[in-house]
């Protein structure tokens, strides 16, 4: 839904829509603002200066369209039970996401999972900085942590902080299914 929303905010022709959607799917964990800048300059070849006002307009347009398009998003099968089991077993659950906190909180409340999450790190902090903060501030041993992600950039992040990675393969375009050095799942059942 997010990839389609990115394509929609640019009113791109079909060929460019596919490029925009593919870019989003491959770079899922990149910040929204950075995706918009990339789409303007690299996919649409926009040569003029892309100022903050234009970027903010696109971000706001994205928010409106995404809110409308995402009302029917469902959880990945079994993830709610999985989160509750982790919590019951005294595991600490953090969310590190390129999405804004209000979106994350919306889904946590919708599926009654807010109380199971210790802390959310959203688009306001770089994912690498967030992971370092989580590991350092809690004296976590890297080998006792696991990161669930759905993009190559999530996998790269885990390599940088030396944390195990589990690919959640809900996105066929992410190219994670071609990698061999980590756990892969399609759902949490």
Language-model-detected regions and their locations in the chain:
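Active-site neighborhood of HAD-like aspartate-dependent phosphohydrolases
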Residues: 1-22
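Helix-loop "lid/cap" segments that line or gate small-molecule binding pockets
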Residues: 5-11, 31-49
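A short, structured active-site edge motif that brings together acidic residues
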Residues: 23-27, 52-56, 113-127
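Metal-dependent phosphoesterase signature
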Residues: 40-81
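Short, acidic loop-to-helix structural element flanking the phosphoryl-transfer center
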Residues: 64-95, 105, 128-131
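Conserved phosphate-coupling serine/threonine residues in phosphotransfer and NTP-handling enzymes
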Residues: 97-99
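Conserved Lys-Pro-Asp/Glu-containing loop-to-beta segment of HAD-superfamily phosphomonoesterases
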Residues: 128-155
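Acidic, Mg2+-coordinating phosphoryl-transfer loop and its flanking beta/alpha structural elements
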Residues: 146-186
């Amino acid at each position: 839904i997010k990839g389609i929303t990115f394509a929609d905010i640019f009113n791109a022709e079909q060929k460019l829509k596919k490029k925009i959607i593919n870019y989003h799917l491959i770079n899922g964990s990149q910040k929204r603002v950075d995706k918009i800048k990339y789409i303007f300059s690299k996919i649409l070849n926009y040569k003029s200066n892309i100022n903050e006002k234009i970027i903010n307009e696109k971000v706001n347009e994205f928010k409106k369209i995404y809110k409308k398009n995402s009302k029917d998003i469902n959880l990945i099968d079994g993830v709610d039970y999985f989160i509750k089991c982790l919590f019951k077993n005294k595991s600490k659950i953090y969310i590190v996401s390129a999405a804004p906190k209000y979106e994350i909180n919306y889904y946590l409340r919708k599926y009654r999972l807010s109380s199971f999450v210790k802390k959310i790190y959203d688009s306001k902090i770089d994912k690498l900085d967030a992971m370092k903060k989580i590991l350092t501030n809690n004296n976590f041993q890297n080998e006792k942590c696991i990161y669930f992600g759905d993009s190559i950039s999530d996998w790269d992040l885990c390599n940088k902080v030396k944390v195990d990675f589990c690919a959640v393969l809900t996105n066929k375009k992410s190219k994670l299914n071609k990698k061999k050095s980590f756990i892969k799942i399609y759902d949490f059942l």
